[in-house]
Amino acid sequence: MQKYLEKANVLIEALPYIRKFNSKIILIKYGGSAMENEELKHCVMQDIALLKLVGLKPIIVHGGGKDISAMCEKLGVKSEFKNGLRVSDKATTEVASMVLNHINKNLVHSLQNLGVKAIGLCGKDGALLECVKKDENLAFVGTIQKVNSKILEELLEKDFLPIITPIGMDENFNTYNINADDAACSIAKALRAEKLAFLTDTAGLYEDFNDKNSLISKISLEQAKILAPKIEGGMHVKLKSCIDACENGVKKVHILDGRVKHSLLLEFFTDEGIGTLVG
């Protein structure tokens, strides 16, 4: 009997959060180990399906960095990084597009199997993500200038769950690889999302990354700005995206450990939460 009471308590604890976030847009940046481990992948898909089925409006922006690197190596295409961003010449961009579109279709299939009306989109579809070149040294890496959010709003209105590949184009129809964190942030801002959640391979933000006891469970926008210059690599890019989002209409940003099963549900629907809350 005790285990049934515990299950009931879990549902009761979740109820006020389900009510609070009903019909709210939740932007989820999906990447890291949660994409690579089949068991974790299934847990994430279950979480997102549940979010959708209890009345939230999730949107997924996915990465695929390790798969892109593996395919580049397999095809003999040189791949390098600068300041946490992949340098993308035409060959690398073509590989990235191919790999990301393959991942996208698999995610659509997974969610459809869970009863969700999922739809896959590339950022070039309907000029969803309009870009300019980010930096000459990064070649075809784009900075988003405009998100044509009307496309996403109409899909949400029709009960679809959009899954977005972070590939965009410029006014001359050149294809650009976009950092998935940047894409998620830009889309969340354009839609003024209730939440933006990053699934990562760390437990969250640390005051000192070498000290695992320095995990930050909650940080204000001003504190995040102070911490950002002290962080390097991919997490620096992620924290900059968090700050940008909070300054531009996104209410809360979450950095979650995608290696923990059901981390999305634990963060959104429990009192304690998990990971780092920014904002």
From Swiss-Prot:
Catalytic activity: N-acetyl-L-glutamate + ATP = N-acetyl-L-glutamyl 5-phosphate + ADP
Cited InterPro entries: AceGlu_kinase-like_sf, AcgluKinase_fam, ArgB, Asp/Glu/Uridylate_kinase, Glu/AcGlu_kinase, NAGK-C
Enzyme superclass (EC): transferase
GO biological process, one term: arginine biosynthetic process via ornithine
Involved pathway(s): Amino-acid biosynthesis; L-arginine biosynthesis; N(2)-acetyl-L-ornithine from L-glutamate: step 2/4
Pfam families noted in UniProt: AA_kinase
EC numbers: 2.7.2.8
Record-linked SUPFAM superfamilies: Carbamate kinase-like (SSF53633)
GO molecular function: acetylglutamate kinase activity; ATP binding
Known function: Catalyzes the ATP-dependent phosphorylation of N-acetyl-L-glutamate.
NCBIfam families referenced in this protein's UniProt entry, alphabetically: argB
Family: Belongs to the acetylglutamate kinase family. ArgB subfamily.
Name used for this protein in its record: Acetylglutamate kinase
